[in-house]
Amino acid sequence: MEILCEDNISLSSIPNSLMQLGDDSRLYPNDFNSRDANTSEASNWTIDAENRTNLSCEGYLPPTCLSILHLQEKNWSALLTTVVIILTIAGNILVIMAVSLEKKLQNATNYFLMSLAIADMLLGFLVMPVSMLTILYGYRWPLPSKLCAVWIYLDVLFSTASIMHLCAISLDRYVAIQNPIHHSRFNSRTKAFLKIIAVWTISVGISMPIPVFGLQDDSKVFKEGSCLLADDNFVLIGSFVAFFIPLTIMVITYFLTIKSLQKEATLCVSDLSTRAKLSSFSFLPQSSLSSEKLFQRSIHREPGSYAGRRTMQSISNEQKACKVLGIVFFLFVVMWCPFFITNIMAVICKESCNENVIGALLNVFVWIGYLSSAVNPLVYTLFNKTYRSAFSRYIQCQYKENRKPLQLILVNTIPTLAYKSSQLQVGQKKNSQEDAEPTANDCSMVTLGNQHSEEMCTDNIETVNEKVSCV
């Protein structure tokens, strides 16, 4: 088989080609041994009149051809990783701005998401660019050796903080479902920030042994010139403590939350059906009551009879929030599981597994895990209207939501409410006249009914007037 590789290279680039030749000879010694033995037979170098070099390669790929191919691969890798870095930084900055500026998003869960966005943003600022640099240098560490342990520490810290935040969110949602009154009473902004501080403290404690021991002994963070965790104990313990244990807690609490929400929804539906049957019962003949009074009686609620019960609206909101969080959990697990599973396999089957294959898989899977930091803002944009509208305004440099002036609200609202109030008063007068002559059999019952309905109508009128005055 003959492979032909032709390229035009200026004479000024020959020294650079020779330097690349030396690098490639270190990486591919077998190819260069065969080249040295058959140099005169395999290649032909000619210089034309325009001082340009034409390279013709037959039967093998010479150093310059190999360097060009590797350079193209590195260019594509650099382009893809640059896109991931930009998406990670920009998207998470938008999330931080949205939670900070939008009052609708200022609750415990979104505070956790903002802290998660800070961890992902720092991962994009401090970890991903260095990882891209190592790719361009053939996975060799190009920076001072002391920075290797610091870089691994930051990588483990922010990755651990991400899953710890998701685990804390899952636990917090489960507690909110189980004890809604207690959770709403004691879950203030200060409590939420204390929980976030606890999450970061745990993440720092898990990742701190890396710089402590790595700065003392380079062999724990260097392997054949590459910056990576070379200590098997670090790999095993770190993988279980920083990923698999929080993952188990997160999955269990999430499914318990879904089960509790389904139970709450079933109870709420049964309560509504029971209330509908009881409220539809009346001591008065339907002929003696107007349709408006029947409607008022059917929706009349006894105060405090269902205190502490969750409404269908709150359950629906919880289900929507769990749906979005479930997607975030699922994507995080799917994107990080391959890396940690391969990491465990590299330690367990060190002798039977091919180290080159394991290393190549880890290099790919770690960037798939990094990609999860860029995906979260996209999930919020797709499934949350408040985030979506906030992001669109921030991209247009509009940091405050445009609201209608109070005068327009008064002009549009007061006439409608005043009209409804007048109609209600007219209807009350007509109904009182119609019910003024009851039959003898229903006299006592109708009198009580009229008193009750008049009180209800009066309350409704007062409520409407209060709304008008408040607006």
Curated annotation (Swiss-Prot):
GO biological process entries: artery smooth muscle contraction; behavioral response to cocaine; detection of mechanical stimulus involved in sensory perception of pain; detection of temperature stimulus involved in sensory perception of pain; glycolytic process; intracellular calcium ion homeostasis; memory; negative regulation of potassium ion transport
Modification Phosphoserine occurs at: 280
A Pfam family the protein falls into: 7tm_1
Transmembrane segment boundaries: 81-97, 112-137, 147-171, 192-215, 233-258, 323-348, 357-382
UniProt cross-references to InterPro entries, sorted A to Z: 5HT2A_rcpt, 5HT_rcpt, GPCR_Rhodpsn, GPCR_Rhodpsn_7TM
Cellular compartment(s): Cell membrane; Cell projection, Dendrite; Cell projection, Axon; Cytoplasmic vesicle
One term under GO cellular component: cell body fiber
Residue ranges annotated as motif DRY motif: 172-174
Disulfide partners: 148-227, 349-353
Site (Hydrophobic barrier that decreases the speed of ligand binding and dissociation): 229
GO MF terms held by the record: 1-(4-iodo-2,5-dimethoxyphenyl)propan-2-amine binding; G protein-coupled serotonin receptor activity; Gq/11-coupled serotonin receptor activity; identical protein binding; protein tyrosine kinase activator activity; protein-containing complex binding; serotonin binding; serotonin receptor activity
Main location: membrane
Ways its activity is controlled: G-protein coupled receptor activity is regulated by lipids: oleamide increases HTR2A-mediated activity.
Reported phenotype of the disruption mutant: Mutant mice display increased exploratory behavior in open spaces and reduced anxiety-like behavior. Mutant mice fail to show behavorial responses to psychoactive substances and hallucinogens, such as mescaline, psilocybin, 1-(2,5-dimethoxy-4-iodophenyl)-2-aminopropane (DOI), 1-(2,5-dimethoxy-4-bromophenyl)-2-aminopropane and lysergic acid diethylamide (LSD). Besides, the colon from mutant mice does not contract in response to 5-hydroxytryptamine.
Keywords, sorted A to Z: Behavior, Cell membrane, Cell projection, Cytoplasmic vesicle, Disulfide bond, G-protein coupled receptor, Glycoprotein, Membrane, Phosphoprotein, Receptor, Synapse, Transducer, Transmembrane, Transmembrane helix
Stretches in topological domain Extracellular: 1-80, 138-146, 216-232, 349-356
Oligomer and partners: Interacts (via C-terminus) with MPDZ and PATJ. May interact (via C-terminus) with MPP3, PRDX6, DLG4, DLG1, CASK, APBA1 and MAGI2. Interacts with GRM2 and DRD2; this may affect signaling.
Free-text comment about domains: The PDZ domain-binding motif is involved in the interaction with PATJ, CASK, APBA1, DLG1 and DLG4.
Function, as annotated: G-protein coupled receptor for 5-hydroxytryptamine (serotonin). Also functions as a receptor for various drugs and psychoactive substances, including mescaline, psilocybin, 1-(2,5-dimethoxy-4-iodophenyl)-2-aminopropane (DOI) and lysergic acid diethylamide (LSD). Ligand binding causes a conformation change that triggers signaling via guanine nucleotide-binding proteins (G proteins) and modulates the activity of downstream effectors.
Protein name stated in the entry: 5-hydroxytryptamine receptor 2A
